[in-house]
């Protein structure tokens, strides 16, 4: 199996922070936490920042990943939320 650069840099288990940017709608945070809870149950405390005009929210949430596949899987699931514009 060929590893990409990010996968080579990480040693598992590790803490990994996602930054999700989406439309400023009340359900955004709940949708993000629900997806993460389904894959990795735990207590998550997302940090939320609003854009200057209030149109977007930036949500940072840290997980404890056991494999690179968990990181990738969550990235794609978070990206598929209809009100999400970007996942970093």
Curated annotation (Swiss-Prot):
<dbReference type="Pfam" id="PF04359">
    <property type="entry name" value="DUF493"/>
</dbReference>
<dbReference type="GO" id="GO:0005829">
    <property type="term" value="C:cytosol"/>
</dbReference>
<protein>
    <recommendedName>
        <fullName>UPF0250 protein bbp_432</fullName>
    </recommendedName>
</protein>
<comment type="similarity">
    <text>Belongs to the UPF0250 family.</text>
</comment>
<dbReference type="InterPro" id="IPR027471">
    <property type="entry name" value="YbeD-like_sf"/>
</dbReference>
<dbReference type="InterPro" id="IPR007454">
    <property type="entry name" value="UPF0250_YbeD-like"/>
</dbReference>
């Amino acid at each position: 199996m060929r590893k990409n650069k990010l996968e080579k840099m990480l040693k598992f288990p590790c803490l990994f922070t996602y930054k999700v940017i989406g439309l400023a709608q009340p359900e955004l945070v709940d949708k993000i936490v629900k997806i993460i809870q389904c894959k990795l149950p735990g207590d998550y405390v997302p940090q939320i920042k609003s854009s200057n005009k209030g149109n977007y929210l930036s949500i940072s949430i840290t997980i404890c990943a056991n494999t690179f596949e968990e990181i990738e899987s969550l990235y794609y699931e978070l990206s598929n939320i209809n009100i999400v514009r970007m996942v970093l």
